[in-house]
Design a protein with these regions (language model features):
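Active-site-proximal alpha-helix that buttresses catalytic centers in soluble enzyme cores
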Residues: 1-92, 197-200, 204-222, 226
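Short low-complexity stretches enriched in small and charged residues
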Residues: 23-26, 120-129, 168-173, 177-181
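Phosphate-handling substructures
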Residues: 33-34, 39-45, 82-156
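Acidic, His/Gly-rich catalytic cores of divalent-metal-dependent hydrolytic chemistry
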Residues: 228-237
Length: 237
């Protein structure tokens, strides 16, 4: 599979996905504007560079798009729309393919909001999850957060047999599902599946714009990619 993104490791990972396996790109939205003056991050949209980033990703895609899924937050839906604008016609989704939104790609089980408002704290929450400190994370485990997200990702994906029947006579390549979510969801998955650790502040260990995980397989037997690593999970959670 071909995929060109600002995160070079994802391009290499995509090339390792077998043609006959249905794939999922689960990614953070593209570059957005910075801190809002009113404190409402949900209103922030993509910058011109973020739009170009999404357009460039779309241009590179060489698999038929089957499903479009997103957080209900506008910048995530905007990222999907900007990606599919530039997908080559033979791989573009059909005109009646809607972007399905789900709170599972927006909300977490836990509360990483600021401590002064009763939350755990943003960077603190993910640190406690990674350290398996359930008490400090206010009763939420990394496994619980991960299962919640994985179940949502694989709820509508194809298994290998369905993927084979989905392809038409002129193609032996299985389809691609696009899902746009948030950095917190990407970090949860990377932490659980690849033992990724973040710092207590914003560093390169945090998820970058348009970065995410690639998957193929089924919920009970899937392969995942993250920052140069590849792992297969059987009956996980």
């Amino acid at each position: 599979m071909q995929l060109l993104t600002p995160n070079e490791w994802m391009t290499k990972a995509a090339s390792e996905i077998p043609d006959d396996q249905s794939a999922v790109l689960f990614m953070l939205h593209c570059e957005r504007y910075t801190d809002p003056p009113d404190g409402d991050y949900s209103k922030l949209l993509l910058t011109p560079n973020g739009i170009k980033m999404a357009n460039d990703i779309g241009t590179s895609i060489n698999r038929k798009i089957r499903l479009l899924r997103s957080s209900p937050i506008e910048r995530c839906k905007q990222t999907i729309r900007e990606v599919i604008k530039f997908i080559p016609p033979e791989f573009a989704p059909t005109k009646d393919t809607e972007i399905k939104t789900s709170k599972d790609f927006f909300e977490l089980l836990g509360n990483p909001s600021p401590k002064e408002s009763g939350g755990v704290g943003w960077f603190e929450y993910f640190h406690y999850l990674q350290e398996h400190d359930v008490e400090a994370a206010q009763g939420i485990s990394l496994e619980a957060e991960t299962k919640h997200i994985l179940d949502a990702i694989f709820a509508e994906t194809l298994d290998s047999r369905e993927a084979a029947s989905y392809t038409d006579d002129s193609s032996t390549t299985a389809p691609l599902d696009l899902i746009c979510s948030h950095d917190c969801h990407v970090i949860v998955l990377a932490s659980a599946l690849f033992d990724h650790k973040t710092d207590m502040s914003l560093t390169s260990k945090w998820c970058q714009f348009a970065e995410g995980l690639l998957f193929y397989g089924s919920r009970r037997n899937f392969t995942a990619f993250w920052r140069g690593q590849k792992k297969t999970f059987v009956d996980y959670l």
